Amino acid sequence: ANAFKNGWSKVKLYFMMGLPTETDEDLAGIASLALRIKDLYHEIRGKYDCRVTVSVSSFVPKPFTPFQWMPQCSVAEIERKQQYLKDLVRDKHIKCDYHDAKTGYLEAVLARGDRQLGKVILKAWKKGCTYDSWTEFFNYDKWIECFHECNIDPDLYANRPRDEFEQEPWDHID
């Protein structure tokens, strides 16, 4: 409220979707908060020139974190959640930005991968996957093709829950 009273008209909110135990109700809470902020601005300033940006990344389970054993949501489920949130926030004063679900999936595969992925990475590089951290160069289909050619199932790295007693590829790192 103080920010609006002092002339601020733009707010950016950061969230993560796809966390373990997340429900659609949690996503609805994101929409509700964004709408409430816009309404609060109108109450305080009497104008409708507020801009709320909601930036939502996808959960990527990473080694050495409490969630390292948890699966990542499938690409289809992340895309469903993104669409659900978009449908809830249909307001010209609120903009939703999303991390690409397919990029997040590849991040999870590589983050929890083992030495076998070296074959995939080399093959992808040879096929031109060099600037894939840039959205305009990322080619998901080419990466999936490389996984298939190497006979490696990327879902085993990203979407599989891991047993806490399982030997992890990163366990040797101290």
Where would I find each of the regions flagged by the language model?
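Conserved C-terminal portion of the radical SAM core fold
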Residues: A1-T65, E77-A101
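Radical SAM enzyme core and accessory elements
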Residues: L88-D174
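General structural signal for secondary-structure boundaries
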Residues: E22-T23, S74-V75, D171-D174
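Generic, ordered loop/turn and secondary-structure boundary motif
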Residues: G18, V60-P61, T65-Q68, A158, ...
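Short glycine-enriched, charge-decorated loop/helix-capping segments at active-site entrances
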Residues: Q68-S74
